[in-house]
């Protein structure tokens, strides 16, 4: 456990963020390895099929992850206030609420999968392969949910090392499973999906056993599973749904944009898949410091230490801006090599378009860095509405661009989409946070 309410914020934020960074890097490394394995051993059609459905699976998975992170903000506030009974109850309630959401998403996703894929304009020659892959991912959502709840709760009490170790085990098993099921057993993209779900199942078991043995304060009882604390339930639903929908709105916009991308041909689908995989690594620190600040702000809000919150937000913003500069240098020096490394493709159209995406979008990363820090900090401070408004603007912007710029300009319209919406969505965030008590008061407590 790590108490983020005491000590130097500059050191605490970095030491707390480092394991999250390594965990996210491991996850993205697996994603890149998975892409390379599918592309190398199954070919461009299989890679395009997976790429055409990645946004859909991300939409669902990111909703669950965002929701669990929202639940964990309440846990962080309980931990910061040193209220261990409510901390334990928050974990029990998180499991119950999350399970209900996962079951609904699983059933809905499987029932409406075919209409959704057709809405996404997945090419007919890729439809069967895409269906096989995403069906397994959706069927494993309950497993994903349990992992998200446990890892988010551990981070809420300051333990970012255990989720890192568990994820490392999961990634190794996942890559090994890919090679076994795809290369040896010839299961195709179905093997890639099965390997993902099985590795997550093992991660859940390991994480649950460790949590039970290590942290007595988190050993939930039957009463902790009952949704009987109206105040906690209201706060958890508000925080969880806000962060879940915040993630979903972003992905709905991206999903709509993907429908236009899928009309541009197989090479563009592959190029965009590669560019997004690489940009996810480039943006990794935005997510890392965003998660860090949600927990940091939550704990310090619970402890009523508002000055530490102000300083922490400024420090995290500075750290991410340094990272942005490194991304720009990387995109302009070895961007094309990274595209080849991810896809294994030597097709000029793939290399050119993916590299162009990286070179243009990285120039505007400073804007999205501020967005991620401010949005997650506001969630940790209990502000739910404005982050949702900001995410809604992103969704609307991408939908409008998908309907206008992409038909007019093709893939360059896709490349321009995110920088445009970033400038739009940062406005309400900056207006709101500068008016919040965090910038005006010396002390603040949870209401």
Question: Locations of the language-model features?
Answer:
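Transmembrane helical elements of multi-pass membrane transporters/channels
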Residues: 15-34, 136, 170, 199-203, ...
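Short alpha-helical transmembrane segments in multi-pass integral membrane proteins
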Residues: 1-17, 75-140, 184-241, 297-364, ...
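Short runs within selected transmembrane alpha-helices of multi-pass transporters and secretion channels
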Residues: 68, 136-155, 163-174, 192-207, ...
């Amino acid at each position: 456990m790590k108490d983020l309410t005491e000590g130097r914020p500059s050191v605490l934020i970095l030491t707390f963020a480092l394991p999250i960074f390594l965990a996210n890097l491991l996850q993205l490394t697996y994603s890149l390895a998975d892409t390379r394995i599918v592309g190398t051993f199954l070919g461009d059609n299989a890679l395009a099929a997976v790429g055409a459905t990645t946004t859909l699976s991300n939409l669902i998975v990111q909703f669950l992850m965002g929701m669990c992170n929202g639940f964990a903000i309440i846990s962080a506030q309980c931990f910061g206030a040193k209220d261990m009974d409510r901390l334990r109850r928050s974990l029990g309630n998180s499991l119950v609420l999350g399970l209900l959401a996962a079951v609904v998403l699983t059933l809905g996703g499987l029932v409406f999968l075919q209409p959704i894929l057709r809405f996404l304009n997945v090419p007919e020659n890729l439809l069967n392969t895409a269906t096989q892959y995403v069906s397994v991912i959706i069927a494993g959502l309950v497993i994903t949910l349990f992992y998200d709840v446990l890892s988010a709760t551990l981070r809420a009490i300051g333990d970012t090392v255990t989720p890192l170790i568990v994820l490392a085990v999961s990634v190794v098993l996942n890559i090994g499973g890919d090679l076994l099921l795809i290369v040896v057993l010839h299961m195709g993209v179905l093997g890639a999906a099965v390997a993902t779900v099985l590795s997550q199942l093992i991660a859940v078991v390991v994480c649950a056993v460790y949590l039970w043995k290590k942290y007595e304060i988190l050993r939930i009882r039957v009463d902790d599973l009952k949704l009987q604390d109206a105040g906690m339930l209201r706060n958890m639903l508000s925080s969880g749904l806000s962060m879940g929908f915040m993630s979903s709105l972003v992905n709905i916009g991206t999903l709509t944009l993907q429908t236009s991308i899928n009309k541009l041909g197989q090479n563009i689908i592959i190029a965009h898949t590669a560019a997004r995989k690489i940009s996810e690594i480039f943006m990794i620190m935005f997510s890392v410091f965003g998660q860090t600040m949600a927990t940091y702000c939550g704990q310090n809000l619970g402890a009523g230490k508002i000055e530490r919150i102000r300083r922490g937000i400024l420090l995290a913003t500075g750290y991410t801006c340094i990272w942005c500069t490194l991304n720009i240098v990387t995109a302009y020096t070895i961007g094309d090599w990274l595209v080849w490394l991810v896809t294994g493709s030597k097709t000029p159209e793939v290399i050119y378009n993916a590299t162009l995406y990286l070179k243009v979008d990285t120039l505007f990363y400073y804007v999205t860095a501020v967005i991620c820090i401010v949005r997650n900090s506001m969630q940790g401070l209990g502000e739910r509405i404005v982050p949702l408004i900001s995410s809604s603007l992103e969704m609307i912007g991408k939908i409008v661009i998908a309907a206008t710029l992409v038909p007019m300009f093709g893939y360059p319209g896709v490349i321009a989409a995110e920088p445009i919406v970033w400038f739009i969505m940062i406005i309400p965030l900056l207006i709101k946070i500068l008016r919040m008590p965090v910038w005006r008061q010396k002390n603040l407590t949870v209401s």
